[in-house]
């Protein structure tokens, strides 16, 4: 399939999941709000997900896919033995790590808990209990990541892209039940408890779902006795630096947790809710592109088809910018409109929504950079180079932490968003310079010119939306009809202006679409 079709498959299913995710977040805002129990749930939800994205999705997939593809060239039986040996070692590690985390959870939660939660003698033990309930999600999703990596290597992208829908459905059911309990502290506590149970259950369901489709694809991974094979050793060597290279975003989240613990109650919720808007295009575009190009790059480089690898990388960057730059511009200008329309109500006040909207604007400054990291790092991983992204990630992290120290006392939670965005752009700059100096990739002047025109088209759209936001501002906090009309006007106007500007500037034409639709082999 072509890059555009693969990204469309992954991104389309991810978009469905994100829609359910927004329904989930609206319910979370209405049921829990920016309260101590809301922060407790966000912390219990963040902890296993940070480890999942850091070790399972980012590091594991980046190291596993090139090694698996190399063995697929030798034959499926060789690839199957490799996957089985990896599973035999991965499962005991996950069990031991999960057990240690369960024991240490009171100290972990107390360390990361915000001041208002830490000082609450009743809320803190509940937060610890919730975190323990949610942590098995890491075990299930790490195993699911192994199965998903196999499916993606076989170019079966749909099943893995659809799996997160199960997560959101489980949480929505739990939240609907929580909403039926009424208002008050006790109702919020019970709702948060059932959300924790639903999270772990969703991990098990996703694992079963992916295993079913792997079997349908004719691939089996059997349980065998643990054995440190040469392939497992090589995978382990690649994973350690990949944790930092592919997981810089998640490492930054640990930094965020530390600084959030120094801020007022509600800050966890503000950042989490704002990040949902940042994650929407990042998940649909960035993760889809990174997932789609890694197997293809691995195949091209194993066959020494360097020109095809260069073409694929250029197309991926152009497509990433074509989609993320306007999304970032639109959310930067109108982020507060979206947070007021979708989140304000119930336990989540209009002031909470306005603060969240400000954080959205800070986060999306780095949206194109986060996507470019997803697009550029596979070029290293496909060459089995997981060390170089370590250095760029470390530099980016130093920049982020330094900015947090300087800005958090002045800007509060907004500083975390801005610092992370600037750090991400530093990461992108270093990744590209290193690729260019090593002769692995250099962006063609033609593509660079098109990207410049993309920024111009997005700027035209952003200015238009800025003028539109002022007369529509009262609508975003008005009746349901006014909110719907206001957000529809912003969305449709932004899409129309960007589309027209892109066509007039030559960003979108038939030749570009045909090039992006070209089949990968």
Tell where the protein language model's regions lie, with residue ranges.
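Membrane-embedded alpha-helical bundles of multi-pass transporters/translocases
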Residues: 1-521
């Amino acid at each position: 399939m072509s890059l555009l079709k693969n990204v469309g498959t992954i991104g389309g299913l991810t978009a469905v999941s994100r829609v359910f995710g927004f329904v989930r977040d609206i319910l979370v805002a209405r049921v829990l709000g920016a309260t101590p129990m809301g922060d407790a749930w966000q912390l219990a939800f963040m902890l296993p997900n940070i480890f999942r994205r850091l070790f399972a999705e980012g590091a594991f997939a980046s190291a596993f896919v090139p090694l698996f593809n190399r063995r697929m060239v030798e034959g499926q039986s060789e690839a199957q033995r490799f996957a089985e040996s990896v599973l035999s070692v991965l499962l005991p590690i996950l069990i031991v790590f999960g057990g240690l985390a369960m024991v240490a959870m009171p100290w972990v939660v107390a360390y990361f808990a915000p001041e208002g939660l830490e000082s609450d003698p009743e809320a803190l033990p509940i937060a610890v209990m919730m975190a323990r309930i949610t942590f098995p999600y890491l075990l299930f999703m790490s195993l699911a990541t192994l199965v998903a990596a196999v499916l993606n290597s076989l170019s079966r992208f749909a099943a893995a892209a659809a799996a997160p829908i199960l997560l959101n459905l489980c949480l929505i059911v739990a939240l609907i039940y929580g909403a039926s309990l009424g208002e008050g502290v006790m109702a919020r506590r019970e709702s948060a408890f059932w959300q924790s149970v639903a999270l772990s259950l969703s991990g098990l369901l996703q694992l079963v779902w992916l295993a079913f489709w792997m079997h349908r694809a004719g691939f089996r991974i059997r349980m065998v006795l643990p054995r440190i094979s040469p392939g497992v050793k090589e995978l382990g060597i690649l994973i350690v630096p990949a944790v930092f290279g592919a997981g810089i975003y998640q490492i930054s989240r640990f930094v965020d947790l530390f600084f959030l613990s120094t801020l007022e109650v509600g800050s966890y919720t503000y950042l989490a809710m704002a990040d949902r808007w940042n994650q929407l295009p990042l998940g649909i575009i960035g993760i889809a592109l990174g997932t789609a190009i890694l197997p293809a790059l691995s195949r091209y480089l194993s066959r020494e088809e360097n020109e095809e690898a260069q073409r694929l990388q250029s197309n991926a960057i152009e497509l990433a910018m074509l989609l993320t730059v306007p999304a970032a511009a639109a959310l930067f200008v109108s982020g507060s409109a979206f947070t007021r329309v979708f989140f304000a109500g119930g336990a989540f006040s209009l002031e909470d929504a306005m603060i969240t909207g400000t954080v959205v604007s800070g986060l999306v400054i780095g949206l194109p950079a986060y996507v470019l990291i997803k697009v550029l790092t596979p070029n290293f991983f496909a060459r089995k180079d997981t060390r170089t992204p370590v250095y760029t990630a470390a530099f980016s992290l130093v920049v982020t932490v330094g900015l947090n120290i300087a800005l958090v006392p002045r800007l509060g939670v907004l500083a975390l968003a801005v610092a992370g965005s600037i750090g991400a752009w530093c990461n992108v700059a270093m990744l590209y310079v290193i690729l260019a100096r090593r002769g692995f990739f250099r962006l063609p002047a033609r593509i660079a010119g098109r990207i410049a025109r993309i920024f111009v088209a997005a700027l035209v759209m952003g200015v238009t939306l800025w003028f539109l936001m002022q007369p529509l501002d009262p609508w975003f906090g008005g009746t349901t009809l006014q909110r719907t009309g206001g957000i529809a006007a912003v969305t449709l106007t932004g899409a129309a202006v960007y589309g027209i500007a892109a066509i007039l500037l030559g960003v979108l034409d038939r030749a570009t679409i045909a090039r992006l639709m070209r089949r990968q082999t």
